[in-house]
């Protein structure tokens, strides 16, 4: 048996102390006996190849605001793995490692998908099959394709003219959306964003805007900051987004997987829905 596993990084290291960011490199067909790069195990989902006999995918689903996210431990004697809780250093050392909840309660699902080839692994619906919707929405989600200038042109592309180019690109390709990444609040501004949303709509394109998760858990400077970690400011921002007709947000750089982080993530999902964003 060999593995395709993404190692869990040390916490509070890397760029602006944002790790673990779940972007580490994996080794293809690594032996099960290998220890993880950082000694903290692996980030879900975890893929194993059983020689010529098939594949196994181990993962987690159904994490909500009342629990924490987990990971797979390093391998122990006998090629055994366990489910591991977040590291103490995550969230800048704040918060608890072990979750707690009132009874009756339930832990997230840990799932194992088995296939004699990769097709059932790729196409599995088990992450949705075993859970129920957590809340009702006021509108239907419209999935689609989009353009994103940052992935190629980085921070320098977050200006009005370059975003017009990427909106035009989305329109020409027949894509539904365009994502405007960090620094838009200072390099484009709230006032000009209104005209950019209107320009995009005339082109048949809707916009997503980037936000920092903010908080005390990293050193991120990219704006907008201090908008998503304060309930009053967050509601005000959502009202503004709704008034412009912005269709969605990308919230970046959470501090970890501790139980304290999950309600923040949950709020970022439910509040936009209530504001039709």
Language model segments and positions:
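N-terminal accessory beta-strand-rich subdomains and adjacent acidic, glycine-rich linkers
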Residues: 1-129
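An acidic-aromatic substrate-binding cleft motif
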Residues: 105-114, 123-169, 173, 177
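Alpha-helical scaffolding within the catalytic cores
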Residues: 131-134, 161-165, 190-196, 228-237
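Aromatic- and glycine-enriched glycan-recognition loops and surfaces
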Residues: 152-211, 215-216
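Active-site-adjacent beta->alpha loops and helix N-cap segments on the catalytic face
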Residues: 189-193, 259-265
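Active-site-adjacent "subsite" loops/lids of carbohydrate-active enzymes
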Residues: 206-257
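Conserved small/polar residues in nucleotide/adenosyl-binding loops
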Residues: 267-273
